């Protein structure tokens, strides 16, 4: 069964080619398909950025920036702080995250990139979890598991070299 194939109000099946938002022929209510918010954190440390090796799909085994879905009731900063802690064991204050970028991501997501305050190298400890095989640093742009992460890291390091923001 295809996701969102039925009206969430009355259960009437939508035509597969019906555009979004979909107006139900059974009850006349409109159904919308909205993007899911994701928080991703750029955490500067020493001369690099913290990345994780994923232990779950998608992109299991690849390096990515820490992040994940924002839970209902969370601000993007709270979601970013929680995801960073869950995936790296590193705790930050939600107020130490500033908006870095917002992009459309894969699978109907809206990715909110937060830049954290730089942390000392001794904050990086060995860490694994259900979601994380490894936490490490990168000191230059590399290919990451998600193309969007690669683009943002490339921009971050370019701005670090030039001292200019907004590249």
What are these regions (language model features)?
Residues 32-33, 59, 106-107:
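Short glycine/serine/proline-enriched coil/turn segments at secondary-structure junctions
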């Amino acid at each position: 069964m295809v996701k969102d194939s039925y009206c969430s109000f009355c259960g009437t099946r939508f035509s597969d080619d019906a555009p979004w938002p979909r107006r139900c022929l059974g009850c006349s209510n409109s159904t919308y398909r909205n993007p899911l918010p994701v928080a991703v954190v750029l955490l500067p440390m020493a001369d690099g950025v913290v990345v994780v090796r994923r232990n779950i799909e998608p992109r299991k085994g690849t390096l990515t920036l820490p992040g994940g879905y924002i839970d209902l009731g969370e601000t993007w900063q709270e979601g970013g702080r929680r995801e960073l802690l869950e995936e790296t064991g590193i705790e930050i204050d939600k107020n130490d995250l500033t908006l870095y970028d917002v992009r459309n991501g894969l699978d109907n997501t809206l990715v909110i990139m937060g830049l954290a305050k730089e942390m000392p190298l001794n904050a990086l400890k060995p860490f694994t979890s259900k979601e994380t095989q490894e936490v490490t640093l990168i000191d230059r742009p590399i290919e990451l598991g998600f193309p969007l992460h690669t683009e943002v890291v490339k921009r971050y390091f370019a701005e670090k070299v030039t001292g200019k923001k907004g590249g």
